[in-house]
Amino acid sequence: MSIKEEVESRKTFAIISHPDAGKTTLTEKLLLFGGAIREAGTVKGKKSGKFATSDWMKVEQERGISVTSSVMQFDYDHYKINILDTPGHEDFSEDTYRTLMAVDSAVMVIDCAKGIEPQTLKLFKVCKMRGIPIFTFINKLDRVGKEPFELLDEIESTLEIETYPMNWPVGMGQNFFGIIDRESHTIEPFRDEENVLHLNDDYELEEDHAMKNDSAFTQAIEELMLVEEAGETFDNEALLSGDLTPVFFGSALANFGVQNFLNAYVDHAPMPNARQTNEDIEVSPFDLDFSGFIFKIQANMDPKHRDRIAFMRVVSGAFERGMDVTLQRTHKKQKITRSTSFMADDKETVNHAVAGDIIGLYDTGNYQIGDTLVGGNQKFSFQELPQFTPELFMKVSAKNVMKQKHFHKGIEQLVQEGAIQYYKALHTNQIIIGAVGQLQFEVFEHRLKNEYNVDVVMEPVGQKIARWIENEEDIKDKMSTSRSILVKDIYDNYVFLFENEFATRWFEEKFPEIKLYGLL
C-alpha cells in the first residue's frame, strides 16, 4: 500500500462533551464495534470493579470522570480510526484544547435531556475557531429528554451552525422504539429481538407491524416529513468547512445508534489535514519526509515503571521505528527505538505509522509539549500549542523533608505533562503551582501521593492573575511586593503574580515601561 493510500485510510477524531453526557461510554462502544475490546467497562459501575477502558488512571476510576486524554486505535471497514477521549471536566480544558490540535474532526456528545451545556459550548468554540468538522451524537434517547426539533434548534441558535439530522428517533424514554435512517429508509428497532423494518419512498411501513398504528411512529413520520419538506440535502463541503454538523440520535449505554453513526462517520469524515509551520510552509500529509509534533506528555502510564510517554501526531511521511529524527527545538538528532500505540493503559510496539496516526514515544526528559520532530534535512517547526493563564495558585511543599527528592521528581514530571504550571518565587525559592481549576490541584495532590509516595502541604496564595513580561531586562527588584510577586516559570521566564485586577492596573500605571501580557 502506498503512503497516499495509507493516509487516506486514517480518520482521527476527538470526542467532546460536558461531564456525564456519555462521552466515555460512546468511546467504549465504538471500540467494541472495532473489535478493539470484548466487553465495555461502565463508568459508573465502581462496585463491580469494571472501569471504562479509556479511564485508566486511578483517580479517574475512583471518580468516574476523565481528567487525562486517552488515545485508542482500531480498524473498521478498511479504515484505521484514532480516537482521542478528552477530559470532560472543565478544569482540564487546557489538555483538551491541546488534544484538539491533534485531530482532524470531532464528535460532540449531547445529553438529550440537557441539550447544550457550558463545557460543550466552550469546546465547540475551540473546534469552530480551528475549523474542525463536527459530528453530533445526541445521547440517552432511552430516557425522557427534549424533543428532536427543540434540540436541533438549540444547536443551531446556540452554536451558530447548521444541522442535518442523519437519522430520526421514534419516541423516547419508555416509548423509545428506534431510529429511522434517512438514507436507507429503514428503521433500526431499539429492542434486539425486532428485525430491521423498511419504509417506502413515502415513509410508509412496508412490513405488517403493530407499530403502524403507534402514535410515536406516526409523530416521528410527521416530523420527518417536515424535515424532508425543508428540502435541504446533505452538504459534505459544509461539514468539512465547519459550517454544518450531521446529527445522530441514539443511546451509547444501550449500544444503540452507535454503528449507524460509525458507518456514516467513516463515509464523511476528513482524512488527515495539511499543517502550517511557523515558517509559513504548508506540510502535506502526502509529503514523503516524516514530520510530527508532541501534543501531550503523560507520566506513569505504568506506575510500576515510572515511565513517561510523549504523545506524537504524525503529520507527514512514514514513521519507522529505529529511524533518525531531529528535535527542532534543540536541533539534536536522535534515534527513536521505543514507540507504542495505546488501548488506554495497554501498550503495543509501533513499527510503522503515517499521517493521522497518534503514537507514544518513551521519554527520558527530552520532549516538551509543542515539540516538532522531523526526518531528513527539513528545517521547520509546527505552530506552538496554546497555554492557558492559570487563575488559581498554591504554595506547595513536601510534608516530610526526607522526601524532597521524590517531591521534586514528581513535580517535574507532572508539570511537564502540562496539567499544572510551575513557578518559583525569586527570593525565597518557594514553589508555587498554578491551575485553571481546583480539581487540577486535587489530582496533583492525589498523584504525588499515589505515584511518588509523597504527602504535600498546599496553601492558597493571595495572587490570582499571572502576567508575563516582554522586556525582562527592565525588571527591578523593587517591583516585587506582597501584591505583585515576581516569580520564574518552568522555562525561566519572569512572571508577575498579582492579587487582583486593581493590583495589576496599579502596577501598569506605576511602571509603564514594563510590558505585561497574559496567555490564553
Swiss-Prot record:
Instruction: Summarize where GTP binds, as residue positions.
Output: 17-24, 85-89, 139-142
**One GO CC annotation:** cytosol
Write out the annotated subcellular location: Cytoplasm
InterPro entries, alphabetized: EF-G-like_DII (IPR053905), EFG_III/V (IPR035647), G_TR_CS (IPR031157), P-loop_NTPase (IPR027417), PrfC (IPR004548), RF3_C (IPR032090), RF3_dom_3_sf (IPR038467), RF3_GTP-bd (IPR041732)
What superkingdom does the record give? Answer: Bacteria
UniProt KW Protein biosynthesis keyword: yes
Q: Give the GO molecular function terms.
A: GTP binding; GTPase activity; translation release factor activity, codon nonspecific; translation release factor activity, codon specific
Which GO annotations describe the biological process of this protein? regulation of translational termination
Q: Key word Nucleotide-binding present in the record?
A: yes
Q: Which residues form the tr-type G domain?
A: 8-277
* Keywords recorded for this protein, A-Z: Cytoplasm, GTP-binding, Nucleotide-binding, Protein biosynthesis
Q: Which family does it belong to?
A: Belongs to the TRAFAC class translation factor GTPase superfamily. Classic translation factor GTPase family. PrfC subfamily.
Q: Which NCBIfam families match?
A: prfC, PRK00741.1, small_GTP
| PANTHER family per the UniProt record, alphabetical | PEPTIDE CHAIN RELEASE FACTOR RF3
General function of this protein: Increases the formation of ribosomal termination complexes and stimulates activities of RF-1 and RF-2. It binds guanine nucleotides and has strong preference for UGA stop codons. It may interact directly with the ribosome. The stimulation of RF-1 and RF-2 is significantly reduced by GTP and GDP, but not by GMP.
Q: What is this protein called?
A: Peptide chain release factor 3
Q: Which organism is it from?
A: Staphylococcus saprophyticus subsp. saprophyticus (strain ATCC 15305 / DSM 20229 / NCIMB 8711 / NCTC 7292 / S-41)
